[in-house]
Swiss-Prot record:
Subcellular location: Cytoplasm
Protein name: Chaperone protein TorD
InterPro entries the UniProt entry points to: Chaperone_TorD, DMSO/NO3_reduct_chaperone, HscB_C_sf, TorD-like_sf, TorD/DmsD_chaperones
Taxonomic source organism: Salmonella arizonae (strain ATCC BAA-731 / CDC346-86 / RSK2980)
Cited HAMAP family: TorD
Role this protein plays: Involved in the biogenesis of TorA. Acts on TorA before the insertion of the molybdenum cofactor and, as a result, probably favors a conformation of the apoenzyme that is competent for acquiring the cofactor.
Keyword terms, alphabetized: Chaperone, Cytoplasm
Gene Ontology cellular-component annotations: cytoplasm
Keyword Cytoplasm annotated: yes
Length: 210
């Protein structure tokens, strides 16, 4: 009997795409409204059903609720983003694999090539940016719904997760240490929990979101 995954491929894909956006650019006014929307609350409630994710989801929910108490929440979130992800001092958490690995950051390029993907010309960040890993994982989970390439895409998913887990824990630790208000700290902890949870799903059957 085939074991069903705790989350469907489409659900993983959507969550990874959402997280990629949050780690790639500052939250604007529209993004802040979305964070506080019923839609995001429903998504977080879905994730919270998984015991491995419950604590990190609850922490992020608390930080989202706390944004309502912060004056100029959007501007302050933008400042947090800048301080963590754009600065180069010791109190930052730069979102690039090459900041944490003692080797050339070429793995993501090979993974993208295997997936038949390329970085958009408009993307001005280095290719080893966290958002690229997350967009790749989103693409791979959507592709797992196509039975003719499921085995290849599942193998590539595992390689991508393993590559990401080589440096994501240290990135998360830096977010926790250096995020003064805790939103991005909570977000990074949720991301790490999801990636580890996904990494435990060794062989996905074909299943659609219900």
């Amino acid at each position: 009997m085939i074991k069903q995954p705790a989350l469907a491929q489409e659900q993983y894909a959507c969550v990874y795409a959402w997280l990629a956006l949050l780690f790639f650019r500052e939250v604007d006014d529209e993004g802040l409204m979305q964070l506080q929307s019923a839609e995001i609350a429903d998504w977080l409630a879905l994730l919270k059903r998984q015991p491995a994710l419950t604590a990190s989801v609850a922490q992020l929910e608390q930080k989202i609720a706390a944004l309502r108490q912060r004056q100029d929440a959007q501007l302050e979130l933008a400042a947090d983003f800048c301080g963590l992800f754009l600065m180069t001092d010791k109190k930052s958490a730069l979102p690039y694999a090459s900041q944490y690995l003692q080797k050339e950051p070429g793995m993501i390029k090979h993974l993208l090539l295997e997936a038949g993907m390329d970085v958009n010309d408009g993307f001005k960040e280095p290719t080893d940016h966290l958002a690229i890993y997350l967009e790749l994982l989103s693409h791979l989970h959507f592709s797992l719904g196509e039975s003719f390439q499921q085995r290849r895409m599942n193998k590539l998913r595992q390689k991508t997760l393993s590559s990401l887990l080589e440096w994501l824990p240290e990135f998360t630790n830096n977010c926790v240490k250096h995020d003064p208000y805790g939103f991005y700290a909570a977000l990074s902890q949720l991301l790490l929990a999801i990636v580890r949870f996904d990494d435990g799903e060794e062989d996905f059957p074909i299943v659609a979101a219900g």
